[in-house]
């Protein structure tokens, strides 16, 4: 299954990519994470209870959303950052923010960091700093299941009648712009709107991260499919203002969470069949 492969990829990526950073002052008291894992906090920086403002969209499954059963914020980002702050002795203060403008707002110092399944790119590195990558995401085409006009990215590009949808301000939009002229791209404020347009027949495909695409396909198994090869493979990371003193401690916490199995537990919770919440549930 795609999601089990993704979970294994998650663990492998963290094993290869994360680099532990030493701290100055440490605490020896174990902390209990949301995942149920006991996290040893020795040899990690102690932020002394510092409040950390975290920008989240609350509209990007499975990273952050409002749980329809409880009305409370939930998702991978919340569990991961809560665990990070337990390790580092900090207090997360979550602030809902629109995706469009979120990265610039972090760059301007409005937030201490942002967590929204954000792709690490060199262009973004010019204005913000990133944590180490914590997951690798493939970009794919989502199409109607009965559409046989294309079976690959290239055959989609070669058909001048086909229009691709995506979300504005994303790396998916950038990828679409690299392969198609502007008049064959329709940008939406959020991916759910793009998928609705696809199902309605207003557009012919949506370029989307595979994690989200599989979620939409699962909910609409009789009407949607993923088509063709991966367009790109991107790493996701947390975003910080340039020069932030939080990057090193957060990277150290991520490395500790990879080592003690917390990240593997989160991968199992959010990137396998265990996660059943859909965008339809959020409506």
Identify the residue ranges that each predicted region occupies:
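C-terminal motif of bacterial Sec signal peptides marking the signal peptidase cleavage site
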Residues: 16-20
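Extracytoplasmic small-molecule ligand-binding "clamshell" domains
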Residues: 36-118, 126
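Periplasmic-binding protein-like
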Residues: 58, 136-143, 210-255, 273-283
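Short helix-initiation/N-cap motifs at beta->coil->alpha
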Residues: 76-79, 94-104, 151, 186-200, ...
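Extended ligand-binding regions for polar small-molecule ligands
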Residues: 78-87, 145-147, 162, 170, ...
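A ligand-binding cleft/hinge motif common to bilobed small-molecule-binding domains
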Residues: 100-104, 118-127, 175-178, 199-200, ...
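Flexible hinge/capping segments at coil-to-helix
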Residues: 131, 144-163
